[in-house]
């Protein structure tokens, strides 16, 4: 019984890792990804149990919704939102989830959520596949990859950081870099 539980727990953990890495089988999910998921299901991974692990509390849901509601559509293709993360546990995670959700808006190529927290602005940048957010975040000293990237800005206000981002997006667009 104990070893079966251990195997099941490990299968759940690995399956949840696949869900996170592929954004629920949306990004970079190939045949081998699905084969691995099927193997883990046969090994005891439970989709319902794993899904319950990813639930968020009501306060985080409300904050994420407020971030989405506050978003500005910039240049008809970028969703940008800001939020003060002080006194919010897991503020950067909530910001990243909001950035993911903003990609569901039709016509949005990239989403950016700027979170102010402890004298730093954390930028979560997301895209589906039409925009390389890594090259944008590299302009701010950050990094990541094609569809998920981030940066941290010091000694700048939330509003100034948003304006810097807009300026960078406009310039890169005009130069044909994005």
Outline where the language-model segments fall.
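Hydrophobic helix-and-loop "lid/oligomerization" segment in the mid-to-C-terminal part
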Residues: 15, 20-178
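Short, small-residue-biased leader/transition segments that mark boundaries at the very start
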Residues: 1-7
């Amino acid at each position: 019984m104990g070893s079966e539980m251990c195997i099941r727990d490990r299968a759940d953990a690995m399956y949840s890792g696949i869900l996170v890495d592929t954004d629920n089988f949306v990004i970079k999910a190939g045949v081998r990804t699905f084969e691995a998921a099927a193997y883990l299901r046969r090994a005891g991974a439970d989709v319902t149990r794993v899904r319950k692990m990813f639930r968020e509390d009501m306060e985080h849901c409300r904050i994420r919704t407020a971030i989405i509601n506050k978003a500005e559509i910039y240049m008809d293709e970028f969703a940008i939102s800001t939020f003060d993360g002080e006194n919010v546990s897991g503020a950067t995670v909530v910001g990243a989830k909001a950035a993911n959700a903003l990609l569901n808006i039709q016509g949005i190529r990239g989403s950016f959520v700027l979170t102010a927290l402890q004298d730093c602005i954390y930028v979560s940048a997301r895209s589906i596949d039409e925009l390389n957010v890594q090259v944008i975040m590299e302009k701010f000293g950050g990094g990541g990859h094609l569809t998920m990237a981030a940066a941290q800005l010091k000694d700048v206000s939330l509003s100034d950081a948003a304006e810097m981002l807009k300026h960078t997006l406009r310039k890169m667009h005009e130069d044909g870099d994005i």
